Amino acid sequence: MKKTIKTLALFLLCLMCLILQASCSSDEEITDADANTELVKEATNYLNGEIVLRTNATMNGVNKTLLPEGCPTKFKFEWSKTDAQTFTISLLDFTVGNMGMIINFKCDVKTMVLNSWEQKEYTGDGWIKFKGEYGSVWGTDTDGSASSAKGSSVQGYYNAKTHEIQFIVNYNMMNVRSECFKQTIDKSRLATFDADKAKYEADLAAYKKEHGIK
């Protein structure tokens, strides 16, 4: 009897492992699938050109942006003319606070559907996922020396209905990342970008003075 119970328990354990493995494999296949074509079409009509977003820049895990509202950051989104599911994200001459480096970045990303775990976090209709690897980064250090790196990456989410967006750029250089926290795109920010950036720099200087940060 005990032997039968042990055999049954072992069988159930193996069955659970197989189900879990199949579920993970299926989820991975779903993640790699193209995003809904209608949502992608809607995305191309809005998520394109220069767009100003609020981001936090981190270096070695330390937030160099310092201010809770983040830094105005101008990204460019350009859709491929040959692959409807692909677009390029670029960022030119980016620096913030005391980061001590000017960064340029470009990466091709592919749109795809969300897996089951992501669907629980990004609820509602309209969400697509975008992911890219093997991007390029080049920049200038404070001493004027040039730097470059391969292998930068992007992963994020965009809602074609509400125009909410969230993504992280890993530059693969000096452990620097840009974190675009979830927000709704406001295209009017492009017209006020220079003024908003100047205000951010002034607020940052005041914050550093108040907290004794050099």
Task: Please tell me what each predicted stretch does.
Residues 34-70, 78-82:
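Tubular lipid-binding modules of the TULIP superfamily
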Residues 6-14:
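Sec-dependent N-terminal signal peptides
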Residues 123-171, 176-191:
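Polybasic, proline/glycine-rich intrinsically disordered low-complexity segments
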Residues 65-153:
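Predominantly extracellular/secreted and cell-surface proteins with exposed
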Residues 56-58, 92-98, 135, 170-176:
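Hydrophobic lipid-interacting interfaces of membrane-associated proteins
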Residues 1-4, 17-51, 171-214:
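Bacterial Sec-dependent N-terminal signal peptides
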